[in-house]
Amino acid sequence: MHNERYDTYVKKDTEKPVISTDPIHVYTDSKPNFKSYIDVTDNLDLNPKIKIDSSKVKTKKEGSYKLTVTATDRSGNKAKKKINVVVEDPTKVVYLTFDDGPSENTDKVLKILKKYDAKATFFVTGNNQKYNDSIRKAEKQGNTIALHTYTHDYATVYSSTEAYFNDLQQISDMVKQITGKAPKYIRFPGGSSNMVSANYSQGIMSKLDSMVHERGYEYFDWNCSSGDAASNSVPAQTIVDNSTNCNYDQIMLLFHDSSPKTSTVEALPAIIENYKSRGYVFKAISDDTPIFHHGVNN
């Protein structure tokens, strides 16, 4: 009879749990169960201990906050992760946006906005600088000044990525001279889904989509259009009908306030009144605004 000896080796667990989640969006005044948003896995422990520190998250106020999650497995391995929590107002919002100004129509738009206690965003150009004081007025009134293009010449702007950023820098410098601030919100000429850029540089929009973010900008397209770009004489009622035919909770509405767009000014009061009657409020773009992107086609 042989006495057999068996040695047992225990491998030490040194692997931390893995914490994963998408960015968390909650409404103001809500009482979110943050644990339900978070997934924790471990190589050996099926039930790691999870600790959530939400002390920095202020659900009474809109904004972006950091939630700290700590996960500890039975071997004492600990993982910690900060997760972005966006607190949003559940109120239905219209973001009125105006491209191609300033012009003589910009001050008229500002008077209407003031009358209805509404805010808007102006994606400005450098094409009509005798009205640049309207940019200052718009900003002082609580609206957002954003960048569109200095020249609005597609052939120049979209000839190369270098040409695009040269144009963008020009309009940024112009706005900074007026307001003292260099905006970080932009709108591509024609929107990110435009195909006209393909006439001048194949694939440029796909490149710019990432390059603008790398340089600290955020671009905004729209999910509702007034149709006022169709011509310089679109009837006001057509603009009203187009503009009020959207039923999203968050609407980014495209207008133009260049010199020919007198019917846009004429239509604006009825559009604001329509959305007010449906429970919407009017906000300018800010860091808390949902991102509206089209699909890039070039």
Task: Briefly describe each language-model feature range.
Residues T97, T121-T125, A146-H148, I186-P189, ...:
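A cross-family glycoside hydrolase active-site/sugar-binding cleft signature
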Residues D45-I83:
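Serine/threonine-rich, repeat-prone extracellular segments and beta-strand-based repeat modules
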Residues R5-K11, N77-E88:
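C-terminal edge beta-strand
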Residues N84-A182, N274, P290-I291:
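Active-site beta->alpha N-cap acidic-glycine motif
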Residues R5-L46:
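Solvent-exposed, low-complexity, repeat-rich "mucin-like" stalks and linkers
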Residues M1-H2, V69:
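Sec-dependent N-terminal signal peptides of Gram-positive bacterial secreted proteins and lipoproteins
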Residues K130, H152-L254, S258-K276, Y280, ...:
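Catalytic domains of cell-wall/extracellular-matrix polysaccharide-remodeling enzymes
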